[in-house]
């Protein structure tokens, strides 16, 4: 099991009111915990890390000798001069490469870095899962809030429809006005029903990321509020360069290319190997009425030195390619640093703009609510007509949706800033 370091990022939370007895409560931290334990992608990544850890051994690197046992039983019969021969042999031998140009050490370093890269990939998967859960959780809250807004607009439309029906029964309204109010109400009802489906889909998507049953329902504890605290760009850049996991993985990839270059250089060294063991043989020959039996036990020990003098330029070309790949990996590191810095600057600008957009959306919604309250009285008193009243309802609907989206966008920006600066990984250790 790989030990990874992480910090769960949670926007400031206020606990909700009484919970439904039929539904289990779910906070953002609980959703993160479920996903980190059960997410399908993380389970696969953990298995890959475990496999890389098993491969990272001195045995795979070639440090230790190999021991083998051989046995054979050969029988032959000469037809022209009848002779029957039986040969039984067995042997055990040890082969050990004592020196091969430090290839064993270079191979072990490569295996260690492959395990490190696999662990880094798991860390990236954890970061992505945390970010997806945060946005998935708040997407559910966003869709639920939109449903509440649509419910309010539908209630207003229903009240207007019932008002027109009552006026018609008293002779104060014509069929045209009633039908218009009915169409508006039915349209708002359809929007409300569609939004209910959107809410259920958002919950199912969240359940999938947590590996929960699709039909599982929750009472979501966390409020739909953003954290609007400010950032310093210099601090973000510093954290990104030191803690960004994708950049760390790119550094590990560069080290792997350096290992590959060292492995190719080791091909220019001689190889010194040891072979030792013991052989046993038993031979039986029968010709006519006589037989001959021989037995032998032969221990042996050999040292072999080999050196490739010429390989038609294979080693030279392989080393040249390895050095080219190493230099390309260095360029990729610089490219990654530049790309991440650009992305960070963009995210920082978006975050600051979205803080201001939220303030604008708050003012817009406040004005729309006041206008809606005033227009309802004016509509019933006949100062404005049904078309004006409907326009004001739509303005409120747009303003409410715009504010909810502004909140979600701000949460998204904060989540992306935390991800790119390595904020989901910290000094606290946790087993995954």
Predicted features by range, described:
Residues 8-16:
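Bacterial N-terminal signal peptides
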Residues 21-68, 174, 214-255, 308, ...:
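Bacterial Sec-pathway N-terminal export signals of envelope proteins
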Residues 22-24, 70-100, 107, 220-230, ...:
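Small/polar, glycine/serine/threonine/aspartate-rich low-complexity segments that form flexible
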Residues 22-139, 175, 272, 276, ...:
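Short flexible linkers and secondary-structure junctions
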Residues 43-47, 60-61, 84, 98-126, ...:
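Sec/SRP-type N-terminal targeting helices
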Residues 125-241, 347-350, 354, 396:
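Periplasmic alpha-helical coiled-coil/stalk elements that build and connect Gram-negative outer-membrane
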Residues 168-172, 379-383, 420:
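A short glycine-centered flexible hinge/capping loop motif at secondary-structure junctions
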């Amino acid at each position: 099991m790989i030990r990874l370091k992480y910090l769960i990022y949670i926007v400031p939370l206020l606990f909700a009111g009484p919970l439904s007895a039929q539904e289990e409560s779910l906070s953002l931290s609980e959703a993160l915990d479920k996903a980190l334990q059960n997410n399908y992608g993380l389970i696969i990544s953990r298995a890959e890390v475990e496999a890389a850890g098993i491969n990272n051994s001195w045995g795979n690197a070639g440090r230790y000798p190999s021991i083998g046992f051989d046995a054979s039983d050969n029988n032959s019969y000469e037809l022209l001069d009848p002779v029957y021969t039986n040969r039984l042999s067995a042997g055990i031998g040890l082969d050990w490469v004592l020196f091969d140009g430090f290839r064993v050490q270079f191979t072990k370093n490569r295996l260690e870095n492959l395990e490190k890269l696999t662990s880094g990939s798991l860390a990236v998967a954890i970061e992505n899962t945390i970010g997806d859960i945060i946005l998935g959780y708040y997407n559910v809250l966003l869709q639920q809030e939109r449903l509440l807004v649509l419910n309010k607009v539908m209630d207003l439309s229903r009240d207007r429809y019932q008002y027109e029906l009552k006026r018609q029964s008293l002779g104060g309204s014509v069929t045209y006005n009633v039908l218009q109010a009915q169409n508006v109400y039915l349209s708002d009802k359809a929007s409300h029903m569609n939004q209910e489906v959107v809410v259920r889909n958002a919950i199912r998507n969240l359940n999938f990321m947590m590996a929960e049953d699709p039909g599982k329902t929750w009472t979501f504890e966390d409020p739909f509020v953003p954290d609007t605290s400010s950032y310093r760009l210099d601090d973000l850049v510093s954290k990104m360069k030191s803690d960004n996991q994708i950049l760390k993985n790119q550094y590990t990839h560069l080290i792997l290319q350096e290992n590959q270059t060292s492995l190719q250089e080791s091909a220019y060294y001689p190889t010194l190997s040891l072979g030792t063991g013991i052989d046993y043989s038993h031979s039986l020959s029968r010709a006519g009425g006589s037989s001959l039996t021989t037995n032998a036990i032969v221990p042996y020990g050999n040292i072999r030195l080999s050196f490739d003098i010429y390989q038609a330029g294979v080693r030279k070309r392989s080393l040249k390619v390895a050095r080219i790949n190493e230099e390309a990996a260095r360029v990729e590191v610089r490219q990654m640093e530049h790309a991440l810095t650009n992305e960070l600057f963009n995210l920082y600008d978006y975050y600051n703009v979205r803080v201001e957009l939220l303030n604008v959306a708050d003012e817009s919604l406040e004005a729309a609510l006041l206008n809606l309250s005033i227009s309802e009285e004016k509509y019933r008193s006949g100062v404005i007509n049904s078309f004006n009243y409907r326009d004001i309802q739509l303005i409120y609907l747009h303003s409410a949706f715009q504010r909810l989206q502004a909140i979600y966008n701000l949460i998204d920006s904060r989540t992306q800033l935390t991800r790119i600066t390595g904020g989901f990984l910290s000094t606290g250790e946790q087993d995954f």
